[in-house]
From Swiss-Prot:
InterPro entries: CELF3/4/5/6_RRM1, Nucleotide-bd_a/b_plait_sf, RBD_domain_sf, RRM_dom. One of its GO terms (biological process) is regulation of alternative mRNA splicing, via spliceosome. Residues 7-88, 94-174, 367-445 form the RRM domain. The keyword Acetylation does not apply. Keywords: Cytoplasm, mRNA processing, Nucleus, Repeat, RNA-binding. RNA-binding protein that may be involved in the regulation of pre-mRNA alternative splicing. SUPFAM superfamilies: RNA-binding domain, RBD (SSF54928). GO terms for molecular function: mRNA binding. The keyword rRNA-binding does not apply. It is found in: Nucleus; Cytoplasm. Coiled coil: none annotated. Belongs to the CELF/BRUNOL family. This is CUGBP Elav-like family member 3.
Length: 452
């Protein structure tokens, strides 16, 4: 029978020819085994070189970890065996974060609140440099069951004096989760949640003008199509006029039928746009799932451009005839409203993607970065989550040892533009996760054919 506070262990660096029956003799000496499962690929069934192990008793797991972790190397392996709590166990499953405490509460007050649910090993109110309470604390029980009982009974149950909301009681984050959250906070502070806002703030004003145009169309779908298109054309010309600072507001438009008057929509002042970025030196990047190219999505923040109607209805095309070759940079500036005239052809043809480019896993030159000193447990998905705040990620890959399927603690991330890559390097190089500091650098052209 398994104890309530039994620990699930992750076993790494085991030979791929060893199955459960071969591993049992190694671990049975520390106690009765409740469950031992070799981890295999769910699609291919191939051995991944690691396993999960749960003893009936918590004490047995601690003994096995102390005796084996990085102490013994199994035949055929280059590195010693790894024996440590699985990620699901490492969630601080006995350690709770308590928020929305009154700032006058002491450690003893918090301990008294949580003692009815079990034996407390640690209880600490977090305080600032001046000694003042931050209104939160960590409480660590002896078992997961006790921690669960405290969450069930206390979370959201009351609002303490001096707190702005009800009591928060939840499992504390792991080191990995804290690291990812800190990375995202750094990215947010640098202003790079929108990938180009760090360097190209004026483009966001351009996007805002497009959003307002779409709002106009959505609210005036019952208008005469010609009147709607004409109004939006005027708004686009005003927003894109380099010599103008304030876009002309769109006044009320009298509908062709009915008595209702649509709401007036005024444009926010839009600064003059900087010269377009020359994108012709970079090869086309893969198309995004919504049909936009990745470069188009970058400069429009995901706003879907409306299809153009006809040359006769597009004064922008006539006014800016010298800018056609920048359509990858300002694609939505050449489209009119598509709703009044559905299923019309696009005026400016987009460059077709080549099949081999759709399968491309690297970005253009200057858009690919290497990351060294990653935590051992980081996977592709966590790498992706770490670098998404800096821009559109084409691929994120942690390098894995083929023999052991264990991380080599480095990887690469490919963006679809150099600015995002530079922003990621600026923010993340030297960033500390646990005991490690990340090393983030640009992949040099001469590295193109090297795996690392």
């Amino acid at each position: 029978m398994k104890e309530a506070d039994a620990i699930k262990l992750f076993i790494g660096q085991i030979p791929r020819n060893l199955e459960e029956k071969d591993l049992k003799p190694i671990f049975e000496q520390f106690g009765k085994i409740y469950e031992l499962t070799v981890i295999k690929d769910k699609y291919t069934g191939m051995h991944k070189g690691c396993a999960f192990l749960t003893y009936c008793a918590r004490e047995s797991a601690l003994k096995a970890q102390n005796a084996l972790h990085e102490q013994k190397t199994l035949p055929g392996m280059n590195r010693p065996i790894q024996v440590k709590p699985a990620d699901s166990e490492g969630r601080g499953d006995r350690k709770l974060f308590v928020g929305m405490l009154g700032k006058q509460l002491s450690d003893a007050d918090v301990r008294k609140m949580f003692e009815p649910f079990g034996s407390i090993e640690e209880c600490t109110v977090l305080r600032g440099p001046d000694g003042a309470s931050k209104g939160c604390a960590f409480v660590k029980y002896q078992s997961n069951a006790e921690a669960q009982a405290a969450i069930s009974a206390l979370h959201g149950s009351r609002t303490l004096p001096g707190a702005s909301s009800s009591l928060v009681v939840k499992f504390a984050d792991t080191e990995k989760e804290r690291g990812i959250r800190r990375m995202q906070q750094v990215a947010s502070q640098l202003g790079v949640i929108s990938p180009m806002s760090l360097h190209l703030g004026a483009y966001n004003a351009y996007t805002q003008a497009l959003v307002q145009q779409q709002a106009l169309v959505a609210q005036s779908a019952y208008l005469s199509p010609v009147a709607t298109v004409a109004a939006v054309q005027m708004q686009q010309l005003a927003a894109l006029n380099p010599s103008s600072i304030i876009a002309t507001p769109i006044a009320s438009i009298t509908p062709s039928s009915g008595t209702s008057t649509p709401p007036t929509i005024a444009a926010t002042p839009v600064p003059a746009l900087p010269p377009p970025i020359a994108v012709n030196s970079y090869p086309p990047v893969p198309a995004a799932p919504n049909g936009q190219s990745a470069s188009e999505a970058l400069y429009t923040n995901g706003v879907h451009p409306y299809q153009a109607q006809s040359p006769a209805l597009d004064p922008l095309q006539q006014a800016y005839t010298g800018m056609q070759h920048y359509t990858a940079t300002y694609p939505a500036a050449y489209g009119l409203v598509g709703q009044p005239f559905p299923h019309q052809p696009t005026l400016v043809a987009q460059q077709p993607q080549q099949p081999q480019q759709l399968q491309q896993r690297e970005g253009p030159e200057g858009c690919n970065i290497f990351i060294y000193h990653l935590p051992q447990e980081f996977t592709d998905s966590e790498m992706l989550q770490m670098f998404l705040p800096f821009g559109n990620v084409i691929s994120a890959k942690v390098f894995v040892d083929r023999a052991t399927n264990q991380s080599k603690c480095f990887g690469f991330v490919s963006f679809d533009n150099p600015a995002s890559a530079q922003a990621a390097i600026q923010a993340m190089n030297g960033f500390q996760i646990g005991m490690k500091r990340l090393k983030v650098q640009l992949k040099r052209p001469k590295d193109a054919n090297r795996p690392y």
